[in-house]
Design a protein with these regions (language model features):
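Glycine-centered hinge/linker elements that transmit conformational signals in sensory
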Residues: 188, 230-266
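Extracytoplasmic/periplasmic substrate-binding proteins
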Residues: 52, 111-112, 249-336
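A structural signal for short loop-to-beta-strand junctions that line the ligand-binding cleft
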Residues: 93-94, 102, 130-166, 195-196, ...
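Extracytoplasmic/periplasmic solute-binding protein
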Residues: 146-154, 183-236
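Extracytoplasmic "Venus flytrap"/periplasmic binding protein-like
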Residues: 68-135, 166-177, 284, 299-300, ...
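Hinge/lid segment of periplasmic solute-binding proteins
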Residues: 32-41, 107-160, 174, 183, ...
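Conserved C-terminal helix/tail region of periplasmic/extracytoplasmic solute-binding proteins
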Residues: 169, 387-440
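Extracytoplasmic/periplasmic substrate-recognition and gating elements
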Residues: 71-72, 77, 97, 147, ...
Length: 440
């Protein structure tokens, strides 16, 4: 990425890039007529694409996609960089220095508008016709009244609790659907000689995944929509203590996960969590979803996986799998190689290889319109759970990832014992108001 900083067009010249953006839709429409930006059209394409995104769990799959694209467009060079820790901070530093990646990521929802001034509106591109309607809805601008398509997704998704079905069978218990059942299950599993939980609590982003069902249940108990409750916290008009599911149940859940979890929870990252669960001696894997199954089965092909929502209170109906597209990839609207970037993303969503990549390589819930069944248990059980119990609200998207990171760090301080529950709540409330209240 260093070289792209040196060759970045100065601010005074961005008019040319904007003009290129205006004309690119016409160019692309012509290409769409011939095999939807298909492979035959791309062999003469050239240029560099700099991708800087989060989600390192998809690094292998994306590298496979890039390798395949090399066969299609041999003169296009794709420089791909990924990180999870401090991604929002690193991205903002790149944007401020003028080194804006050609493709960058954020959460969907609120952050679509946060980064809209840098994002190309994909409306009219072949990719939008192929995109799942629910995913496309997450890419619209709330400030523009639900218009535009300012991103694409690596995946739709399912978030929830993963368990080792063999361990639950051996212990004679079913998957917990209430918080009390979860605590009892952890006791039973440990008494039988297994580890109950592996948490990944070193990663800030696992907390935002864990908390979604709690946010939804807290709002429901108060007779309000989750989005409205989150907006109150952002405005500085709500306290965690006002919501028993957050003040009591959430911390009870975290305490239970730590008590029955990894020896060093704050040193257990995604890889450590995957290794611990795949070893076959741990009952519950927290904070994850459909994206980990391929890694788990690569380590232990005999693993029997179960998947459902998080147990958050006394009502099994609130134990819901959360589905949707939580992440957006943005195309930089003033990219020097805008057409080359558009050709790549259109190929990804419309070519036969690109469409099969989602299920066959990445093992994710496809963000495209498709009837193809998945070979992955989490995706199929997630789909079944949503059909039976409905989907939980993708509530992390009502906040920015800058807040979500601060939330994760506040919870890490709580687990470390450096802040108590009330101080942690005060910090979360302060961050929600200062980070996301200011972002509105």
């Amino acid at each position: 990425s260093g070289s792209s900083e040196e060759t970045q067009a100065p601010a005074a010249d961005t008019g040319d890039a904007a003009q290129e953006a205006e004309t690119s839709e016409e160019t692309d429409a012509a290409e769409a007529d011939t095999e939807a930006a298909g492979e035959a059209d791309l062999s003469a394409d050239s240029g560099e694409i700099y991708i800087f995104i989060s989600s390192p769990e998809y690094a292998d799959a994306i590298n496979t996609l890039i390798d395949e694209y090399k066969n299609v467009a041999p003169n296009v060079t794709i420089n791909y960089e990924t990180t999870q820790n401090d991604y929002p901070t690193l991205l903002k530093a790149k944007i401020n220095s003028g080194d804006v990646p050609d493709i960058f990521s954020s959460t969907s929802g609120m952050e679509i508008d946060t980064y809209r001034e840098y994002s190309y509106d994909l409306t009219g591109q072949p990719i939008v016709d192929a995109m799942d309607d629910g995913v496309a809805a997450a890419m619209t601008s709330a400030e523009e009244g639900g218009k535009g398509c300012y991103g694409l997704a690596i995946k739709g998704n399912y978030f929830g609790l993963i368990w080792n079905q063999n361990i639950l069978d051996d212990c004679g218990i079913s998957a917990p659907e209430t918080l009390d059942d979860f605590k009892k299950a952890c006791e039973t599993v440990e008494a039988k000689g297994y580890q109950a939980c592996t948490t990944g609590f070193m990663e800030w982003w696992v907390y935002k995944h864990n908390v979604m069902d709690f946010l939804n249940a807290a709002a429901k108990a108060n007779g309000e929509a989750t989005a409205d409750m989150v907006a109150k916290f952002q405005a500085g008009e709500a306290k965690i203590k006002d919501y028993s599911v957050l003040y009591d149940n959430w911390f009870d859940y975290i305490d239970t996960a730590v008590k029955y979890g990894d020896d060093k929870p704050l040193e257990t990252d995604l890889s450590g969590e995957e290794q611990a669960f795949a070893a076959g001696n741990t009952a519950f894997m927290l904070g994850q979803g459909a994206w980990v199954e391929a890694d788990l089965l690569a380590i232990n092909p005999d693993l029997k996986i179960g998947f459902g929502g998080y147990p958050v209170d006394a009502d099994p109906a609130d134990c819901q799998v959360v589905s949707g597209s939580d992440q957006a990839l943005h195309v930089y609207k003033d990219s020097k190689n805008l057409q080359t970037v558009l050709n790549f993303v259109n190929w990804w969503y419309t070519s036969e290889y690109g469409q099969s990549w989602f299920t066959d390589v990445a093992g994710v819930v496809p963000p495209i319109k498709t009837d193809k069944e998945s070979a992955y248990t989490i995706i199929e059980q997630g789909k079944k759970s949503v059909e039976e119990k409905g989907s939980g609200d993708l509530s992390i998207c009502y906040s920015t990832d800058s807040f979500n990171q601060a939330f994760g760090e506040a919870m890490q301080s709580y687990i470390a014992g450096t802040t108590d529950k009330d101080a942690t709540c005060a910090q979360i409330e302060k961050d929600w108001h200062e980070i996301d209240g200011a972002a509105k």
